[in-house]
Curated annotation (Swiss-Prot):
It comes from the Eukaryota. Keywords: DNA-binding, Metal-binding, Nucleus, Transcription, Transcription regulation, Zinc. Its main location: nucleus. Belongs to the ERT1/acuK family. The keyword Plastid does not apply. It is found in: Nucleus. SMART domains: GAL4. This is Glucose starvation modulator protein 1. It comes from Candida dubliniensis (strain CD36 / ATCC MYA-646 / CBS 7987 / NCPF 3949 / NRRL Y-17841) (Yeast). Residues 20-48 bind DNA. GO terms for cellular component: nucleus. PANTHER family: GLUCOSE STARVATION MODULATOR PROTEIN 1 (PTHR47659:SF8), ZN(II)2CYS6 TRANSCRIPTION FACTOR (EUROFUNG)-RELATED (PTHR47659). Residues 63-106, 250-269 are annotated as: Disordered. PROSITE patterns: ZN2_CY6_FUNGAL_1, ZN2_CY6_FUNGAL_2.
Length: 565
């Protein structure tokens, strides 16, 4: 039995740099001297030696070459041989060597396996094939990824091909093209419908559509005429990817997206090639929009949004609702649809500004939001007004060059902070339809009713503003502290930054940028200085509470201020 050590002995014990073989196997505490104490106690001191550690590959100099060589040196599993395989010609040996990697990689199984079968059937040196050679052919016949009806038929007598290393290793360009998704969606599909369409010249010579049909067979990489992938899952994935390429129109403030994605609307969906047998190619001299509409109607269409040019006008199409995308030119809505009764009432989609003094008097209860007219809030105009205000605050003609430079540096800091989170806001809201914007505004007004009731029960002065800084509510005591009238602050577009000094504005944007995206912190404590109407400064300690919308984007900021006397 192992002797129990005292606490002092345990403290004095130090682990050995390297254990001996015996201590390593028995998981004992070895000592640094040789022979060690454990081996001396057991009378095996003559065999006490350091354990040989296994060195890692990067220390021994072994790299990728060593790994490859070890894999290549591994003996392959031998197939069940036959008398034919024992007396194999040099060409046959090359064929068997090349068949195994093709079988494992499964890149071009259809073409190569067909070529191998033809070679087996037409090899003059091969005599009658025994019956036990059939398992070899069964192993070599891998189920193809595509239908191989377009390949060489090995059953036709007299068919003979020359089996060389070049035509075995070099794949068919069209087969490789159909097996590459990126090439298919960018190269092959764009040949059928683009601005410099090749068919226009073909149709001018021959209008019967035969050249077009032949080019469609070639360009589609043997996927036309009803031939599809063998996997239903892969077919559905190709359908959805093709619909996204054809119909999705990206709306982004970056110029790179607007120059390429929005203008390239004439790309044909790859999913339509499996259904081209339903389309009359003789009518391809009609406009492109009608052709694309036929491609859509040939199967149940999966869409994430239509472009304005190719939006269908058939009310029976299940994607027609998404044709009316959100644009900057928002039009009025007069007809009530069969959709959500909460949203579909007499509502106007407008970019006109409605001051908070009107909305606060209009929506005094929750039922008013559903019974009275509601207008959406257009945030881009609010951000433009904010930018103009910041330029006025941090500008000035009667300042020294040093003061101008200091104010300019602060303005640049603020604009960089706004640019850090505003693209995320745009990305979250760019695909929203007009009813979604109304729903967000209704959520804001409904939350505002609750917060205004809470502010009446709270003794601290309170101001509420949108994420742009636009004031939407202020208590009377806070307005009196700042020597303002609450009606004057709410009758027009006013920002909370008009009531702060320069340093407080910079501090606020630093805090807001940290919690605007990613960080879901909802409470911020800080100290700021507010300006009165007579340009006096009052120092406040304040708490900012952030209310977020369904996209976790700040919707309302509730600021509670306590003056420091």
């Amino acid at each position: 039995m192992t002797k129990k050590l005292t606490p002092q002995e345990k403290k004095n014990r130090k682990p050995a740099v390297r254990a001996c073989v015996f201590c390593h196997q028995k998981h004992l505490q070895c000592s640094n001297e040789r022979p060690c104490k454990n081996c001396v106690k057991r009378n095996i001191a003559h065999g006490c030696k350091d354990i040989v550690r296994k060195r890692v590959k990067y220390l021994t100099g072994e790299g990728v070459s060593g790994t490859v060589s070890s894999k290549q040196s591994t003996p392959r599993k031998k197939l069940k041989t036959s008398p034919l395989s024992t007396s194999m010609s040099p060409t046959d040996s090359m064929k068997s060597d090349l068949a195994t990697p093709v079988e494992s990689s499964n890149h071009f199984p259809a073409s190569i396996s067909s070529s191998v079968d033809v070679m087996t059937a037409t090899q003059p040196s091969a005599m009658n094939t025994p019956s036990d050679a059939q398992p070899i052919n069964d192993i070599l016949e891998v189920p193809p990824l595509f239908d191989n009806s377009h390949m060489i038929n090995s059953d036709v007598p007299g068919t003979n091909i020359t089996l060389t290393t070049q035509n075995l290793i070099t794949p068919d360009p069209l087969s490789f093209h159909t097996n590459t998704v990126s090439n298919t969606t960018t190269d092959v599909l764009n040949k059928l419908l683009n601005d410099n369409y090749e068919t226009e010249s073909l149709l001018s010579v021959n209008n019967n559509g035969d050249h077009l049909l032949e080019m469609a067979h070639t360009s589609s990489g043997h996927l036309s005429n009803g031939q599809q992938f063998q996997s239903n899952y892969l077919n559905e994935e190709y359908m959805m990817l093709g619909d996204i390429i054809l119909q999705s129109k990206q709306v982004s403030p970056s110029p790179s997206n607007t120059s390429t994605s929005e203008n390239n609307t004439n790309t044909l969906s790859p999913s339509s090639f499996g259904y081209m047998s339903n389309i009359n190619f003789e009518d391809f001299n009609q406009p492109k929009k009608k052709v694309v509409q036929k491609l859509k109607d040939s199967r149940p269409f999966i869409s994430l949004g239509f472009t304005e040019e190719l939006a269908p006008h058939d009310s029976s199409n299940n994607a027609d609702y998404y044709g009316h995308r959100m644009t900057n030119d928002i039009v009025g809505k007069t007809d009530e649809g069969p959709g959500n009764p909460i949203i579909n009432y007499n509502t106007k989609f407008t970019t006109d500004y409605v001051p908070p003094s009107i909305t606060n008097n209009l929506y005094k209860t929750a039922s008013d939001l559903y019974s009275k007219e509601l207008k959406n809030f257009y945030y881009p105009l609010s951000y433009h007004a904010l930018t103009k205000l910041l330029k006025v605050i941090f500008g000035g003609n009667n300042l020294s060059p040093e003061e101008k430079q200091e104010k300019r540096s602060k303005l640049l800091i603020i604009l960089k902070l706004i640019a850090s989170y505003r693209p995320t806001f745009i990305a979250a809201h760019r695909d929203l339809i007009q009813e979604d914007l109304l729903m967000l505004e209704m959520t804001l007004q409904r939350s505002l009713l609750d917060y205004k009731k809470l502010a009446e029960l709270n003794s601290s002065p309170t101001i509420m503003w949108r994420r742009t800084g636009e004031i939407i509510s202020i208590t009377e005591d806070m307005a009196l502290l700042l020597e303002h009238s609450s009606f004057d602050l709410l009758k027009e577009r006013r920002f909370i930054f008009e009531l702060m000094d320069d340093n407080s504005i910079v501090d606020y944007f630093n805090l807001f940028a940290n919690i605007a995206v990613g960080n879901l912190k909802s409470v911020i404590q800080t100290a700021i200085q507010m300006k009165t109407k007579s340009s006096n400064l009052i120092k406040f300690t304040c708490v900012f509470t952030i209310k977020r919308d369904i996209f976790d984007i700040p919707m309302i900021v509730i600021g509670q201020f306590l003056p420091i006397v």
